Amino acid sequence: MPTSVYVSFDAPEGVPATPRRLHAALSAVLDLPPGIGPARASQFPTLAHRPPHGAGSVKPYSLGELCHSESTFGVEVRFLDDRLVDTLDAWLSWGGVMRVGAGTEDDAVLIATEGQIINQASWEELAQQDQDTAWEIRLVTPTTFSSKGHHVPNLSPATIATSLQQRWWTWNRRLAPPRIDRHAMASVLATQDFTHSSTVSLVMPRNSGQGRLSSRQIPAHEGHLRISGVEGAEATRIFSRLMALSAYTNVGSHTSFGM
């Protein structure tokens, strides 16, 4: 069941909370421990659902909203597989200590003070949410899209929908919306694009399956956009269902790096 959890931390000032570093810290909690592969983990109920560390594929968890003040730090963690919520809860019960940084003595040490489920929906409920016709989309972190090893420069409703559909297919193919019709979406969905381009640095793992990059500098999108659709159109209804899932996951490529 897709679930969103907000975790509060006691934190020092100046937490080096880049998305990539936060994702790395979170993966140390939720991924399989180093040296344990999926085949061996499948024999143990407490490990079978945890994703392998270092895999380039989309993981069943992602970062959401962040907030911080002088002494507290909070992060939303989104789950497509709620069994990982039990993993997070077990970690919290053992103190919830998280190191964020570059792996040096200057790392910030955070101590979890509270974890709370803030949103939850069944796949059946998400599949029925097809009545919305307008969306305000804010990109929380720099977001980039690629296909067959090549970057996709344009940010369109179909691009976002395809990314969300891939996640839905991975975690619940039975209830997933049908295959995206890009032409139909382009004809009924209008976009006001307030995003801008930025450049981020990234090195792809060899086992990512996303192709080797010719450059470590990758174009990304930041900002927000508004999308509106023709009421009653099938493509609008499909987009509505997919956007319902966006509350529990992320979009784009290279998300295993925290983007």
PLM feature spans:
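RNA-interacting cores
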Residues: 1-259
